[in-house]
Design a protein with these regions (language model features):
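ABC transporter nucleotide-binding domains
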Residues: 3-6, 13-187, 192-206, 210-212
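ABC transporter nucleotide-binding domain
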Residues: 171-261
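Short amphipathic alpha-helices in soluble, non-transmembrane regions
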Residues: 240-244, 270-275
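Acidic, proline/serine/threonine- and glycine-rich low-complexity intrinsically disordered segments
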Residues: 279-280
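Conserved small/polar residues in nucleotide/adenosyl-binding loops
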Residues: 283-290
């Protein structure tokens, strides 16, 4: 049975007559890296603020670590970065972590050294944060979130502004956390391709609504270049494709859609083939090219 670290049931956040989030049903399995994808303004940060207790929900339920009561206690197991967290620019990385350690009442001073080594800043020495690169600041922010060894890590847009090398470093670090510490991670981004080689499952937010949740395997299937058509007669359509179009590389889906993975430059030919045979009616025919088409 799948164990969920985080669940929401019909979670909503309303500002007067505007829903920033509406009836969101989210499930994040233990040990996964969950990619929360949505354009700016989709509700990603609002959702994260509700999960971490920085804002109050209007409706629905939040369940953390299997519990919907005493969420304040459950949230003590969460580490998070929301947008770019405040760092003390005149301090070193070590000093920043020490301030956070004291504020949180973490007794183990060794956690500072361990965290610096984990995030790759053990050699930063006396260099002030003001002189850090953006990538170094992002890693330090991650280090702050990791203090206390949280079981659930929530990162809001952590790849913003990172160069390709920085993204790769972050990706490897997060994978290491999952593998070695069994941390579950929620990571948000408005660019799906930034998460494509990192996340193991995905949720897509649009205008405050969670459109769908899919696995990496399902996403890869979605991302294969294909022609998608919908029909009210699957059997006749597939016979036409095979016998008259000589098309055999396709998949049929429960929603009466067919995805064709060959003849991708011949959409017009396929359209003509179907329209010239009155036994088949179709309502949707287009080619998917990239992640952004989803």
């Amino acid at each position: 049975m799948t164990k969920f670290i985080c669940e929401t049931k019909n979670l909503s956040k309303k500002y007067k007559d505007f829903y920033a989030l509406k009836n969101v049903n989210l499930t994040i399995p233990k040990g996964e890296i969950y990619g929360l994808v949505g354009e700016n303004g989709a509700g990603k940060t609002t959702l994260i603020r509700l999960l971490t207790g920085l804002n109050f929900k209007s409706e629905g339920e939040i369940i953390l670590f299997g519990h919907k009561d005493n969420l304040q206690h459950e949230r003590s197991k969460i580490g998070c970065t929301i947008e770019m967290p405040a760092l003390y620019k005149d301090m070193t990385a070590s000093q920043n972590l020490e301030v956070q350690r004291i504020q949180r009442g973490i007794p183990n001073k060794k956690c500072i050294t361990d965290t610096l080594e984990l995030i790759g800043l053990s050699n930063a020495g006396k260099k002030r944060v003001a002189n850090f690169s953006l990538g170094m600041k992002q890693r330090l922010a991650l280090g702050v979130a990791l203090l206390g060894e949280p079981e659930f890590l929530i990162l809001d847009e952590p790849v913003n502004g990172l160069d390709p090398t920085g993204i790769i470093e972050l990706r490897e670090l997060l994978k290491k956390l999952v593998k070695e510490r069994e941390v579950t991670i929620l990571i948000s981004s408005h660019i799906l391709s930034e998460l494509h080689q990192l996340a193991t499952c995905y949720g897509f937010l649009h205008k405050g609504e969670l459109l769908k949740q899919i696995s990496t395997e399902e996403l890869n299937e979605e991302c294969k270049r294909h022609i998608c058509l919908r029909t009210d007669n699957i059997q006749k359509t597939t016979l036409l494709l095979e016998q008259k179009g000589n098309i055999n590389n396709y998949s049929v889906y429960p929603d009466n859609s067919i995805r064709i993975y060959e003849c991708l430059d011949n959409v017009r030919m396929i359209s003509k083939l179907l329209s010239s045979n009155g036994a088949v009616s179709y309502t949707h025919l287009r080619a998917h090219e990239t992640l952004s088409d989803l």
